C-alpha cells in the first residue's frame, strides 16, 4: 500500500523509463540523414522481416511493405527498413547520436526525481541489439527524454534543456533564478 501511495506522487514523465518503440524511428532516421547514409528517396525492401545473425526479426506487417522510400518507411513504421538504416549507421555512430540527442543522461529539467534511461554498454552491443534499438526496443528512456530529443528535429537541430520556469524575479526586480536557454547542436539545421 505504501508503494501505491508513493507512486501516485511521482511524475511519470521523468521518473519512469520505457521502450520508446516506433517513436524512436525519427532519431534513427535523423542520424542517418545527418551522416548522409540515406536520403528521403533512399529505397528499401520489406519482406515482413529482416534476418540479423540467427534472428528473424519481424515487421509489424507480417506480409511486408515491399519496396519503399525512406519517407514511406517512416509513414509505414517499417521495422526492417529501420534495421537496415541502423546497420548502415553501425554501433559506434548509432551511439554517437544517442548521446548527441541527450538520451544517455538526464535532461536537466527542474523537476525532482528525474532518472536517466538505460542503454547497452557500447562495447557489448551486438548486431541484434543494434537492429532492435533502431526501431526503439531493448533500451529505456523517459517520456521527457524522448520529447526533448524529438524536439531537436523541430528546433533546427538544437537540443534544448527543458525548464518549467524561465525566470524568477523578486519584488525589487532582482533576478533570483534565470534558466537561460541552454542548448547544444544535435544535428545540422538542414538535416532537421
Q: Language-model segments: what does each one mean?
A:
Residues 1-22, 27-192:
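Beta-lactam-recognizing serine transpeptidase/beta-lactamase-like catalytic domain environment
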